[in-house]
Amino acid sequence: MNLKHKWDVYSRLTRLDRPIGTLLLLWPCLMALVLAAGGMPDLKVLIIFIIGVVIMRACGCIINDYADRDLDSHVERTKSRPLASGEISTKEALLLFVILGLAAFGLVLLLNGLVVKLSVVGIILTIIYPFTKRVTNMPQMFLGVVWSWSIPMAYAAQTGEVPIEAWWLFAANWFWTVAYDTMYAMVDRDDDLKIGIKSTAILFGKYDRQIIGLFQIAALFCFVAAGWSADRGLVYGLGLLTFVGFSTYQQMLIFGRERAPCFKAFLNNNWAGLVLFVSLGADYLF
């Protein structure tokens, strides 16, 4: 395997070629840093968290593909993944996971002790998540915790504590993550039913759209509460109204439960997250 091919394999294994997951992980993390700092976060902390998000998203993808390597070959969307297709060995993939995990932990060691403790919990959650798809119909709810764990870490890094507003933001991101990852699971629902993978898309059944809507409403409420507890104003409120618009559009996309529109609805959440972050940051400027 030449260097170019190896880079291609590694980038697909870590999803560097598909940054949507990294972005969905990044927006709430940046929101947490801005809220914790009351505006512009400490530059060192900001850089560490941006790099950390990229690395930990890569780690999560590796361990997910390792756990699903015998199943991914049976799913149309995932059968070409490097571990499923045999382009990379499990040993090499796990070695890359360890290297990246140590790099992320090295970054955390530049921060305070509370962040270090929270990071240990975060890496454990990251390792556990892929295996929940075999034992529970609600892996998306566990993913919501994993995907939101950077929020208390961001507050701890910036302020040395995790106040109530952090947990409002945590709850908002948890509800939002379950909603958009259920849309994502709707894409694979037929394949997952055949091979025994569990998901909220299967659990919710014919009520999937309605329950996703309830989670979107709950996310909105918690985003409002997080902003209220931090004394945010009109600009952030406009961002929340835009979030409602995105959520409505996503409901229209998933109405027919077809694969392509459901995936488009999932991708649309990146723009929702971007608008929330930008509106929050702008709220501190105006």
Swiss-Prot record:
InterPro entries: HB_polyprenyltransferase-like, Prenyltransferase, UbiA_prenyltransferase, UbiA_prenylTrfase_CS, UbiA_sf. GO terms for molecular function: 4-hydroxybenzoate polyprenyltransferase activity. Pfam families: UbiA. Its EC number is 2.5.1.39. It is a multi-pass membrane protein. It catalyses: all-trans-octaprenyl diphosphate + 4-hydroxybenzoate = 4-hydroxy-3-(all-trans-octaprenyl)benzoate + diphosphate. One of its GO terms (biological process) is ubiquinone biosynthetic process. Its cofactor is Mg(2+). Gene3D superfamilies: UbiA prenyltransferase (1.20.120.1780). It is an enzyme of class 2 (transferase). It is found in: Cell inner membrane. GO terms for cellular component: plasma membrane. The chain crosses the membrane at residues 20-40, 43-63, 96-116, 142-162, 167-187, 210-230, 235-255, 266-286. Pathway: Cofactor biosynthesis; ubiquinone biosynthesis. Keywords: Cell inner membrane, Cell membrane, Magnesium, Membrane, Transferase, Transmembrane, Transmembrane helix, Ubiquinone biosynthesis. Catalyzes the prenylation of para-hydroxybenzoate (PHB) with an all-trans polyprenyl group. Mediates the second step in the final reaction sequence of ubiquinone-8 (UQ-8) biosynthesis, which is the condensation of the polyisoprenoid side chain with PHB, generating the first membrane-bound Q intermediate 3-octaprenyl-4-hydroxybenzoate. Belongs to the UbiA prenyltransferase family. This is 4-hydroxybenzoate octaprenyltransferase. The lineage of its organism: Bacteria, Pseudomonadati, Pseudomonadota, Gammaproteobacteria, Alteromonadales. The gene is ubiA.
